[in-house]
Amino acid sequence: MSHHSSPPPKHKGEHKGHGLPRGSERGSSSRDKDRSATTVSSSAPMPAGGKSSRTNCPPPAPPKTVNRLINEKSPYLLQHAYNPVDWYPWGQEAFDKAKKENKPIFLSVGYSTCHWCHMMEEESFQNEEIGRLLNENFICVMVDREERPDVDKVYMTFVQATSSGGGWPMNVWLTPGLQPFVGGTYFPPEDGLTRVGFRTVLMRICDQWKLNKNTLLENSQRVTTALLARSEISVGDRQIPASAATMNSRCFQQLDEGYDEEYGGFAEAPKFPTPVILNFLFSYWLSHRLTQDGSRAQQMALHTLKMMANGGIQDHVGQGFHRYSTDRQWHIPHFEKMLYDQAQLSVVYTQAFQISGDEFYADVAKGILQYVTRTLSHRSGGFYSAEDADSPPERGMKPQEGAYYVWTVKEVQQLLPEPVVGASEPLTSGQLLMKHYGLSEVGNINSSQDPNGELHGQNVLMVRYSLELTAARYGLEVEAVRALLNTGLEKLFQARKHRPKAHLDNKMLAAWNGLMVSGFAVTGAALGMEKLVAQATSGAKFLKRHMFDVSSGRLKRTCYAGTGGTVEQSNPPCWGFLEDYAFVVRGLLDLYEASQESSWLEWALRLQDTQDKLFWDPRGGGYFCSEAELGADLPLRLKDDQDGAEPSANSVSAHNLLRLHSFTGHKDWMDKCVCLLTAFSERMRRVPVALPEMVRTLSAQQQTLKQIVICGDPQAKDTKALLQCVHSIYVPNKVLILADGDPSSFLSRQLPFLSSLRRVEDRATVYIFENQACSMPITDPCELRKLLHQ
């Protein structure tokens, strides 16, 4: 199989897909190469249309007016503030106007680093005539999906249920009562041979609204009712969750069926990193180590991670991972970089190192965090959301996807002309790097995936040979080749700094910041790197200082980077959603285990209490995605039921509840965990691969967690040695507790038995509690390591 591939195909809306194998429930968000560029879904018939090219679009007129989005904080909304469209932000003003004027609402949802959102704005929303059509016939509302995931999820559910898939930009037409009746993703501006254009869609919807309004309203109500029934998740008459062993086995088998033996990963291109799947495979391996399936699960996960890290989906020059690969080989990515990918991948590469002992994986994890520190970090400790895929090749030019990341042979030769001393043939540093990373004179990007010729002659770096093979090819020592390549990459990095940069979305989201706190805490603890744990602590302090309302105990969803390093808030604040609480609580629990600072555990307990009050469904079990009051206008109140690019907040919450029960002994949290798993058991039974994170938690709940208690002085060397021993080993189903002997401490008040534990011979001592049994006291790190490996 050739390693030649191509840049992201120029079609379809942007997708943050799940990369799940075929057969996963509601997993059709990933971009499908064979789909047309326009998806239209409707509760009433829509006429077919034709094809269009972006080159047919008339150039946009210079901006004449500023719309009301200029008063927003969201980078995505601000990108549309100079459109001729009379945009409203999501809110009562727009809803009241739609009802008063009896007009349908045109809702457009996207995010600031979305390539196809940029395309639609450039082609349609900047177009004066299209702007006039929108303003005269609709109330136009723009939503940043990252600010309002509840709005996005409700209407994406409609689009996915009534069409072949979903993506962004998502464009939906609503009744004045906010019920959807037509929806789609990216629309080209004009009709072509096979696709309907946006202008035509607008005119036909106008006609339908005038001529068949009652039919549209009836159909919309019927579809909404059907979606409500379909999305119902409830305990029902089930008493206990499904069998973990059965769910585990079925989930593994479904993953095994979709596994790519040669390149790793699951399903067909485009390929997504899917950390939730890799987490599941590692957990499955641990509980099935002595079986063939267990070995297979480990091999699948490690091979996938190695192929991803060697592929072009990793930025070999500046570190960090791009959103997904457009090809089977992980070569040509969609170049956007998302914070949530960096957070989850840093953890899963750290786990790969814990399991394999291969420093390769640790280096990748450290590289990811280096990228986040350098590019996605606010100086006050918070983390930005994303970097765009598009940037101008040169200043003053139109942005192109991937321009910041690709290289020509000529550029590399000019930057790295030095001869390599000791090579078996004449060789420059540039030639060595190009050989190792697969660069060619004509470029290594296939023209079939670059239809506009924007990346002709360009190259995406991808490791083509092992260090050993490259060294043998030129008669060099492996370490010499490693040093030469690292020096070369650093020179490329310094040169790349002078290119026009991609747009940085400096919005900070509580949920993704929580994931990133986990990333720094878990990696720092496992690798014994205190500076990474310190960065996790800074992130948690940022969350508490800027994204937590002390008076109400609630999290805020967003804040924004202001001028001069300041932090700005929206007014009124955007309050947190379920995922904000779930991911922040997980981050705080991981940070407590990494730092042993009990204040983070205390805050996690308070946030969990607030989460339970705001989102728990006392009748059906599980958590709703949004507060009842915040989502009161929406036609659906949903429960997140799929682990995708990010884990489901219900999956994460189930594991949080399990850990909190072990940290505190509070039975009500175990009861909630069991109730949640029972509510989702039918989803897991039907398609376990759609909820691998929840299946993993189900196993942990039925096997029980280990309580690893270390009695000792937190600052003493022997205590630190035992802590580091625990951190260095892959033990996912555990809680780590430091008992310092103070009966008045927070943890001793939660778990009174901690006060009765004693150090042996005044040395730091470990006790392991599992299945209501306690191990013999352990003081030797080697003995502890042996026991944890059993």
Swiss-Prot record:
* Cell compartment(s), UniProt: Secreted
Q: Keyword Phosphoprotein on this protein?
A: yes
- Matches recorded under Pfam families: Thioredox_DsbH (PF03190)
**Gene3D superfamilies membership:** 1.50.10.10, Glutaredoxin
Q: Does the keyword S-adenosyl-L-methionine apply?
A: no
Residue ranges with Basic residues bias: 1-19
Keywords for this protein: Developmental protein, Differentiation, Phosphoprotein, Secreted, Spermatogenesis
Spell out which residues are annotated as carrying Phosphoserine: 5, 653
Q: So what does this one do? A: May play a role in fertility regulation.
Q: Please provide the Gene Ontology terms (biological process) for this protein.
A: carbohydrate metabolic process; cell differentiation; spermatogenesis
Coiled coil stretches, renumbered: none
Record GO cellular component, one term: extracellular region
InterPro entries, per the entry: 6-hairpin_glycosidase_sf, 6hp_glycosidase-like_sf, Ssp411, Ssp411-like_TRX, Thioredoxin-like_sf
Q: Where is this region: Disordered?
A: 1-67
Q: Which domain of life is it from?
A: Eukaryota
User: What ranges does the record list as Basic and acidic residues composition bias?
Assistant: 23-36
Name this protein carries in UniProt: Spermatogenesis-associated protein 20
Gene behind this chain? Answer: Spata20
Chief place of localization: secreted
